[in-house]
Amino acid sequence: MFYQSSSSLTQILHSFCGNTEMETPYPKLIDPSKTRIGWIGIGIMGSAMVSHIIAAGYSVTVYARDLRKTKDLQTKGARIANSPKELAEMSDVVFTIVGNFNDVRSLLLGDDGVLSGLTPGGVTVDMTSSKPGLAREIHAEARRRNCWAVDAPVSGGDAGAREGTLGIFAGGDSEIVEWLSPVMKNIGTVTYMGEAGSGQSCKIGNQIAGASNLVGLAEGIVFAEKAGLDTVKWLEAVKDGAAGSAVMRLFGEMIVKRDYRATGFAEYMVKDLGMAAEAAMPGAALSKQLFTGMVANGDGKLGIQGVVSVIRRLNGIS
């Protein structure tokens, strides 16, 4: 992510505001004591991410269909909205990180959605892994309403969310992404990828590479098992060679220990890889089949490292 000095950023804002061709005034400088944050999506990752923002001093309002999920955040100071529209009316910037693109469409573009309540000059930031085309549609509708929209899906799993070290892939207007940096720095590192939809395209590419890497790791471990090797020693032997990777560091020991706690749901990986189908990606298609096998076995809510269970079944290992 690129950062400007405060004086440099102020100059950018003043020059941007002075552009009479812009229908929407550039948003006011972010100030934790004044900028109101709205948040939709308080699952494993979302609750950790918004907790960092609350800890940084921002006033935060959350919306959840199940109010029981909001109790912990309420103890930290979060307020509750009764609908996405009401949340938007109470916010300057609204973040969403939900299950799938249908939820995104409803929450942002629906009759009672975020954009129906956001004040002109407001900003939406969708951090869900979603479709590039939907991100462009949301951006166009936001601009029609004199608001702004950024697509900013993340990578790093629940560990990255807890530690505030997520990778964030941003698409949209570069000045808006820059403007958001005082908030975004609390949850991770932003890389600006380009126009609306570019963040989502980056995330799909990330998932293709990550899933294929994870499947390869799982197959390597199962092969080592079938060969009678000590899989802990196998991991130690190969981790610093060409086969070593962040995926191996994150998931290798968990796979060996059959620890399938969710760091990212397998069913979401199926969704993400499905969005790669518009291009000829045979490796991604094979990976999708294996993760789909997890879901078919009733393991869709397990962590993505559980894909090894499908490979073990194929090899007759219980």
Swiss-Prot record:
Keyword NAD: yes
EC number: 1.1.1.31
GO BP: valine catabolic process
Entry GO CC: mitochondrion
Catalytic activity of the protein: 3-hydroxy-2-methylpropanoate + NAD(+) = 2-methyl-3-oxopropanoate + NADH + H(+)
Subcellular location: Mitochondrion
Pfam families: NAD_binding_11, NAD_binding_2
A GO molecular function held by the record: NADP binding
Positions with a binding annotation for NAD(+): 35-64, 129, 271
Coiled-coil segments on the chain, per record: none
Main location (coarse class): mitochondrion
Keywords of this entry: Branched-chain amino acid catabolism, Mitochondrion, NAD, Oxidoreductase
Family: Belongs to the HIBADH-related family. 3-hydroxyisobutyrate dehydrogenase subfamily.
Protein name per the record: Probable 3-hydroxyisobutyrate dehydrogenase-like 3, mitochondrial
Organism per entry: Arabidopsis thaliana
